[in-house]
Amino acid sequence: MPFIKAQKVRRDESGRVVSGSASVVDTEYVPGARYHSRQRVRERLGRVVELAEDGRSGVFRSPTRGLVRYDADTDSFEPVERGDGTLDDESSEFPEPSAHVVAGDSLLLLSILESSGLLAVLRSAFPKDAELERLLAHLLHSVLRDGSRVSCDDLVARSAASHLLAGVSVPSLRSDSAYFHAMGDDRAKVAFFRSLVDAMRAADPSFGTCCYVDSTPLPNDLADNPFNAFSSHGLGEAAVQSRLVLVLDDATGIPVWYEVIPGNVVDVSTLARVREDVGATLGVTVSSAVLDAGYVNRELVGGDMRYLARMPARRGYPFKTMWHDVKPQVNRGKYAFVRGGHAYFGRHFVREVQGTESHLYVYVDKENALSCLRQTMTDRPEEYEAMLERDKDWEQARGGFFVLISNMDEMTPAGALDAYFSRMEVEQVFKTAKDHLRLLPIAKWTETAMRGKVLHDVICTVAVLRVRKAVAAAGRPWSPTDLWGKTSSLMCFRNGPSLVLETPSRQCRQRFEGLGYKVPAKVDVAAYRRDVLGLRS
C-alpha cells in the first residue's frame, strides 16, 4: 500500500502548513534486502498545502497535476476547485485577481469568438463550466501571447480574464496536466468536431467536402514521444517519426478532424481508415488528399481519389529520371518563379507512372540546393572532389530537388506548388507540440497529453482563422499581432461587481469600431459570464 512521505513540513502557530514537500512512496518486497523491503518514489507531490494529522491524505501543489488532493488509503487523486470545501483557507491558492489589469485584447478576442459562433461551439462541446473556463483561459493565452514565451498563469493573472474566468485557479494554469489529459480523451475530440461541423453546416448547407493532409512528420526530437516509430518514406534515410494527419474543409481550410499516427503506418490503408472514421463520425466526405511520399503506391496512383503528393525516390518511380530530363533547363529564366522568398525552377510533364498517366511537377528550390551544396563542400571536401562530373551536377541540385505527382486537373508548376504549400502550411501550426511538452517532466509525455495538445492547437487555429476572417470581412489590413498590440493598452479595474474600463486610445478604439464593436465603459462580470460566455455560475 502506498504512503505519503513528507519532508521538512513546518506549521505556524495556528497549525497551518507554511512549507514542506511530499512524495507518493511504494514499499516493495525484496528478498535478501534489509527488512526484506525497499521504498520507491512513485510520484512527487510537490509543495504541501494541507496535510492530515495521520499523514494519509492532504492537498498538494503538484508540479505535474497542479493543485490536487491525494488520499493514500484509496490511492486516488482529486482536483481541488474554488469553493468545494477542500481547503480551510483558499486565499493562498486562489488569490484575488489584481485590481488593475489589461482588458482590451481579451475583450476583443472574446467578442470576435462570440459573433463568429465559436463560443457557442465550445459551449456545446464542453457543457461543464469548469471545463469551459479552463479551455477559454488556455485559448486566450495561446492566441494573445502571439509567439511570446509568457506562461499561461502570468498572462491570465494580468488580464481581465482573471475576473471573467474566476472559477479557474490561476496558479494551476502553469502546468495544467488535468486540462491536456481531459482534452486528449476521444470524447472531447468527437464532441468538439461534431459541434464545429454542425455549426459550419448550419452556416453553409453545401459544407461537407474535405481534403486529407499529411505532408510532413511531427518534430522527432522528443525521444519519449509515444507515437514515434522507426520509418522511411523514400526521400531520405530512415528516421524515428510520428505524423499528424489533418482533414481540412476544402472551402475554408478549417481543420475538422485530426489523427496522430506512428510514422511506420503511413500508407493508403491509413488514408482509407481516416476517411471511414470521418464519414461515420461527422458525415463529411474526404474527396482529395495532399500527401507525403510514403503514401504513394500503385493503389493510390491508379485509384479514384484526387491527390497531390511528393514522389518517392524509390524503384518504380522516375524520380532521378526527371532530374536528367530537366538538368539542361534548370538555369533557364523562363521556368523560374519565386514563392515564400525562395527562387524555384519548375516544369510540368505528363508521364505514365505505375501504369497510369499522371501529372508530374518537377522543381528545384535554388536556396535549399545551394545551402546543401555549400554544406557538402565545407564538411566533406574530399568526398566532393572525388565525385564524377555527373554526380557533382546532381549534388548541386540534390538539396532542393523534388517532384510532385498528381491526378488532379493540369496546373502550372507555380500553381501546383501553391496548392501543395497552402495545405502543408496549415500543418506547421501544429508542429510545435514540443513547446508544451518542454515545460513538463518526462513522465508527462503521454499519448493522452499529446493528443490533448494537438486538439488544443486545432481549437486555437480555428479561433485565429475566425479572427482573420472578421478582419478581412471588415476590409481592414490589421494582423492579429497588430490587433492585440494596439488593444492591450486598454486597462480596467474592479469596482464591486463590475470592471470599469479606462478611456481607450485612438488606435484601440479604431480596432474595436473597425470590426463593428463598441468599447464598453464597464462590464458587469456576472452578466458577461452568463450572457456572453454562457457560464451558469
Per-region residue spans from a language model:
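Dynamic "connector" segments at or just before major functional cores
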Residues: 1-212, 216-222, 246-264, 499-537
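Short amphipathic alpha-helical "interface-anchor" segments enriched in bulky aromatics
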Residues: 415-443
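Short, flexible loop/turn motifs enriched in small residues
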Residues: 16-21, 236-242, 397-399, 425-426
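Short helix/loop capping segments that flank catalytic or ligand/cofactor-binding pockets
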Residues: 32-33, 147-153, 163-165, 220-223, ...
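Acidic, metal-coordinating catalytic cores used for nucleic-acid/nucleotide bond scission
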Residues: 266, 289-299, 313-315, 448-449
